[in-house]
């Protein structure tokens, strides 16, 4: 192996994609489940340069002949370069987190910062916050140690913090939907930063957005930034414009990996347009209504007849949460998906939402849709749901012309979303 990543578990790593997109060299993922395997690998030194992830960022320091002062102060190395048999250790997580905060206008000067978690990434983010002038940095733990000045999550809510940083795995794929801090009860918050990058928006970030926190950002751009700075060490050269490269690769990753969800009234064209979009973009097509039928074994009219709309909506939420946490899908949603906020969180966590807007007079009546029994029913439904569609959507796609027109409008909207 020349270049690559070592760690105990690497199943969901994006590092290979990022490095090969950035530099074109072959980048291996090398899982080393045990400490013995990690030590044997490091002792052989049969690589040019590697990145190191959990749980070996501290262990690798034992094998380094030189450790960058910043990495030494943090107590963790995530980038190792082999120079004629001598290992040189650096910490580009610091640089990546600093870039993320700078890029999104997070100002630490004079602020109170709470950091969720006590692991290695805590030390990295704490160093950045202190170096950028934070007045106070507080540590939050599920099992706080008063002798270390640690706070509980309940105490963090009343800490007066302006900035929250999450360094725990709470809300990380596949265990999405977890949020241990009530950010809505922290009115002075200016920024919430989560180092978790899968899903794109954790439950913490989604709730911060709902609470109106000015800056709420996940960790994907940090991941890309630390990789770019690691590649500079790998190749012993600076990129001409690293921030531009970071933005380019982050946008490309989101475009490639995020879901696209289509919402709108029954018979507005979500399924037909969705299949075309999925084919054009190379995504897996998912029809949530079809998945409900597959899982339950009954038709939608039969579910409504037996359990009512509430029973159907519960099943709809289950399927939305099942598919919403995955990636690279085109998801066609039922017309009533917007009636439950948890559905929208599930769709937004790892995707963008397009509202397919078709004139109500062009919608179909009946057709096995229990709530579309008449045109009057459709008009009433549209009046109730339209504000919800508009609030949920990242873009509105008119569908009052040809299918090609709608497809073109959707592609243009996606370009604008992913390139912004």
PLM regions: where:
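NTP-dependent small-molecule kinase module
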Residues: 244-255, 260, 276, 280, ...
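Adenosine-phosphate binding glycine-rich loop
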Residues: 31, 195-258, 399
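A glycine- and Lys/Arg-enriched "phosphate-lid" helix/loop adjacent to the NTP-binding pocket
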Residues: 349-388, 395
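ATP-dependent small-molecule kinase phosphotransfer cores
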Residues: 290-348
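Phosphate/diphosphate ligand-binding glycine-rich loop within oxidoreductases
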Residues: 2-104, 199-201, 205-207, 211-217, ...
